[in-house]
Amino acid sequence: AISLAILGGGLLAAYEYAVRRVEQGGAAVEPAYESPPQSQFVSGSPGSLIPFETLSREGRRFTNMALTRDEISNVMGTPATCDPIRLFVGLDTTPEVEDRVDLIMDELIRTRAFEREVLVFASPTGSGYINYVFAEALEYMTLGDCAIATMQYSMLPSSMSLTRTGLAIEQNRALMHAITGYLRGMAAQDRPKFVLFGESLGALTMQDIWRHRTVEAMDRDFVHSSIFLGTPSATEFAKAWRLDPGRIDPDGTMLEVDNFGEVVDLDPAQRAAARHYLISHYDDPIPKFGTNILLRRPWWLGPGDERPARVPKSTTWRPGTTFVLTGVDLINAMDVVPGRFGRRGHDYREDIARFVSAAYDLPVTAEQMLRIERALRARELKWAQDRVVSEQVARAKEALLREMKNWGVSSGAGGSADSLLSSLLGEAMPAEPAPVKKAPVKTSPAKKAPAKKSPAKTSPAKKAPAKESPAKKAPAKKAPAKKKPAGPLPLIGE
């Protein structure tokens, strides 16, 4: 008994240590996202009520990756209406649920989010991740006239955040009440199209706001439509709906499909009625994994001719073994390649744009959809490449600082390392070759004669750096903006 107690204590200590390490990684500042966003329409910006340093790794990514008007216009072939709104309250922003809700409501009002065409209440995964493909597809299709609001409840992967779902549901329910209360005070014609989004654990923590209730309750909360990707098997609302869809959704507005092709094949009347989409791949283990498969054969391992597509007919259920193997599948299902969209396992990127258009009633032309799909892939690949390059540069800088310390260089080492590293990188891969191309002017005849006769021609060369000086002074202009949160902030547009 003593040995078991010691073993149990050791395992618990190891788990807690692992949790702390993962949380530290979730709060870490990535080199690619060290600087706060400059758009006043996103959290963490100089005009935001939310400090950038409290957003966590996923929050900093989410706010920094918002599209600009120019990016939207270039893809859609028509001028963007406005800059998109992205609001994120981190787990470290404030410790109390009530304070987080108040803070994000203040941000919604500050940015005039309730005046946008579409307002999205999104529930993140355990780590705080909001699907970038979803967010960008929405911003393209609305021409920027949209807002996405979300609150973090954990910095751990979804598999390690299962004990925090109660907090997440409570937090989401509190924000839902706050948003619907605000919408209730608006005239019907002035309200935005209020929609929901959740992926993986985010789908569970959003749907279970209405646990033991019905789709009609969602309608009473002004919810226009929703998209849920890879809904976990433990989701109470989804389980109740699957068992008795006629009671939970008498109007048939909720559908569960594997891919968008199944939506296209629907009866026209059924497709027209659909507003709430549960997208669950047949080979995604997230909607299948649960303690219920430990001792009981799951429905998806029934007779071979009744199994969903892509579930091997040769696979048999074994007590305990099936549970372990399905758990292993959880890891493999989330293995994705940036820029290469798939439609397998827990990767839903392939169909997201079309589901956004269909569920949220945001029609686009076939040409625009093609351009959106291409842009989504290109952007995801670019962001991934930028992160890799930034991390490599950061590691090189750290190595250089250590070497300089060994040389006895301590004062101003950081600045020296930055300068030296920039010089080395500039020689290897000049980012701005324009000044180098102008160098041949020195070899022109103007160099030989006028250089000696008239010093006036050398003076422009001395003044040339002055053209770059505003760029160096630019941060000084931004400094006052960071001091604004000390007092009441005006609404954007006032």
Regions found by a protein language model. Give the residues of each.
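C-terminal His-loop and adjacent cap/lid subdomain of alpha/beta-hydrolase
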Residues: 1-192, 212-433, 437, 490-494
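Hydrophobic alpha-helical segments that drive targeting, anchoring, or assembly
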Residues: 133, 197, 464-465
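Gly/Ala-rich beta-loop-alpha elbow adjacent to hydrolase catalytic centers
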Residues: 197-203
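Low-complexity, polybasic segments enriched for Lys interleaved with small residues
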Residues: 434-481, 485
